[in-house]
């Protein structure tokens, strides 16, 4: 069975985070593990508070993630949006190193809304890639990189696509926001399973 890790930090966007979790689990071919990433506002190592004040109990805390997945890489890692949540994810240096490690190993690295610009860009994995994010956030990558890398270097030879609901370029998958979460989630299902599984899931859940 394929493995997917979903990283959650306080301030994550609930629809963007849990739509992929739900659809991937419905495929019955992907084991999805949610991971709570520490942040200054966290009171419990497992409980993460969404941007709309919905608490979610993660499957693993961050120490458990490090004990189980630093060497045994999953097939996919995913970062939801929400500006505060994305900023909390981006502040974690161990997570940035893990993104680079998974990317270099050919694992799928995926993000939606604020996360492509805030979390992924400064790791350098968007270089030479087609990608998308929440509208207008691509203009602020210099700010999000916070001096760790210049925006011109982070996005060297990349193409920002502002119209498509999601972009898949090699092992990098990005999407725009809450309204594109379902299409994005189904692309992740297709990539980790197959087109027929995605089709059956689309029919079974009465998608438009």
Q: What is each PLM-predicted segment?
A:
Residues 1-105, 117-122, 127, 138-163, ...:
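Extended, subdomain-level signal for the structured scaffold at the beginning of enzyme domains
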Residues 133-136:
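Catalytic cores of processing enzymes, dominated by hydrolases/peptidases
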Residues 109-110, 131:
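A short beta-strand/loop micro-motif in the catalytic core of glycosyltransferases
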């Amino acid at each position: 069975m394929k493995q997917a890790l979903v990283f959650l930090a306080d301030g994550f966007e609930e629809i963007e985070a849990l739509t992929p979790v739900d659809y991937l689990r419905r495929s019955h071919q992907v084991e999805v593990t949610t991971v709570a990433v520490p942040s200054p506002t966290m009171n419990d190592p497992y409980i993460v508070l969404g941007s709309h004040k919905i608490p979610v109990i993660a499957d693993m805390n961050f120490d458990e993630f490090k004990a189980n997945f630093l060497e045994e890489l999953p097939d996919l890692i995913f970062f939801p949006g929400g500006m505060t949540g994305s900023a909390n994810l981006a502040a974690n240096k161990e997570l940035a190193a893990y993104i680079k490690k998974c990317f270099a190993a050919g694992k799928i690295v995926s993000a939606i809304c604020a996360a492509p610009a805030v979390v992924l860009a400064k790791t350098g994995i968007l270089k030479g890639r087609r990608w998308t994010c929440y509208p207008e956030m691509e203009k602020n990558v210099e700010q999000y990189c916070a001096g760790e890398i210049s925006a011109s270097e982070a996005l060297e030879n990349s193409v920002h696509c502002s119209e498509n609901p999601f972009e898949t370029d090699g092992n990098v998958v990005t999407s725009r926001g809450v309204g594109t979460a379902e299409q994005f989630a189904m692309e992740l299902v297709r990539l980790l399973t197959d087109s027929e599984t995605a089709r059956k899931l689309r029919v079974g859940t009465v998608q438009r």
